[in-house]
């Protein structure tokens, strides 16, 4: 066992934190990303715990906070993000100790629950070691864009092509690019929301998709001057697949949903393999009309009560924009 100590993040730790993230293959963290995610989140006190050994940082576990509708009430939900442990300190309880430290801090600032989307390795730790509970997972849907993409994925052949097209100001089919979100976007979300989900008001939407250092394309569907829906699309490469991803979609009627989905497809450059999404049950027909199909892949979802109340087990709605890595 290697000796280490734990402590809260201090500003002087930032460069060592970045170095650890890069060393474990998570190099997207830089000053701009850090300041946006941790310092400008409109609903988030900064919560980062570190493990130190021999004068360096060997472990990190952070949490972000999001205003969330839970059983019709607005609550503050804590979400673990940006976790890393130096190789020689793995399987020694570093992550578990940092995570429990964060859970205690989150409860102290008023978050009654915490949820996350674990990978295969962290799922066992969350559920078996830390007392989290499995919640209904979410199936990934995909709109294939290249005929050979599925076969190439099955064979493990990676793609580095595709991406987002150059930005265009063109309005087509009642859908136009959105520069920033106004109050009408938050009002639209409020009028259509069902189930348990993160609050999408004007401040959140602009922080998440406009002020971000990441590249997102935002579109609004209009009837005359009235906003009737909006969508956000981005691009990533995961497991060798060049994928567009639907970060968000809010539209009360199927016509606008389909129009927005088709515009998101058009925004992806040649070489992109697919556009992926998480699909609410009531939206499935619109996604089928836009060429999406359900895949075999499901995203794990786990949660834990921090105040002793029963954890809502069903009726959760998430989008890929709710993940810290999209």
List each model region and its residues.
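Active-site/acyl-donor-binding loops of N-acyltransferases
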Residues: 112-163, 232-258, 262-326
């Amino acid at each position: 066992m290697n000796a280490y100590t734990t402590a809260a993040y201090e500003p002087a730790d930032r460069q060592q934190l970045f170095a650890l993230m890069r060393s474990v293959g998570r190099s997207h963290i830089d000053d701009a990303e850090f300041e946006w995610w941790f310092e400008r989140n409109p609903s988030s006190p900064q919560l980062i715990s570190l493990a130190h050994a021999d004068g360096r940082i060997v472990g990190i576990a952070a949490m972000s906070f999001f205003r969330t509708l839970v059983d019709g009430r607005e609550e503050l939900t804590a979400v673990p993000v940006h976790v890393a442990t130096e190789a020689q300190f793995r399987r020694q309880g570093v992550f578990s100790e940092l995570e429990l430290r964060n859970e205690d801090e989150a409860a102290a600032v008023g978050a009654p629950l915490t949820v996350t989307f674990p990978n295969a390795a962290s799922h066992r730790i969350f559920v078996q070691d830390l007392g989290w509970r499995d919640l209904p997972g979410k199936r990934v849907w995909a709109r294939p864009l290249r005929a050979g993409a599925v076969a190439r994925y099955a064979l493990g052949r990676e793609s580095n092509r595709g991406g987002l097209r150059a930005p265009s100001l063109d309005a087509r089919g009642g859908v136009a690019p959105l520069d920033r979100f106004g109050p009408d976007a938050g009002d639209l979300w409020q009028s259509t929301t069902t189930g348990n989900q993160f609050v999408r008001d004007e401040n959140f939407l602009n922080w998440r998709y406009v002020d971000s250092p990441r590249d997102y394309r935002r579109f609004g569907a209009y009837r005359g001057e009235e906003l009737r829906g909006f969508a956000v699309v981005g691009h990533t490469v995961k497991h060798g697949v060049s994928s567009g991803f639907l970060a968000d979609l809010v539209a009360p009627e199927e016509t606008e949903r389909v129009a927005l989905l088709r515009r998101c497809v058009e925004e992806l450059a040649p070489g992109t393999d697919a556009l992926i999404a998480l699909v609410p049950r009531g939206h499935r027909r619109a996604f089928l009309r836009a060429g999406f199909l359900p895949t075999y892949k499901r995203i794990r979802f786990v949660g834990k009560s921090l105040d002793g109340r029963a954890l809502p087990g069903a009726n959760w709605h998430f989008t890929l924009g709710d993940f810290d890595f999209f």
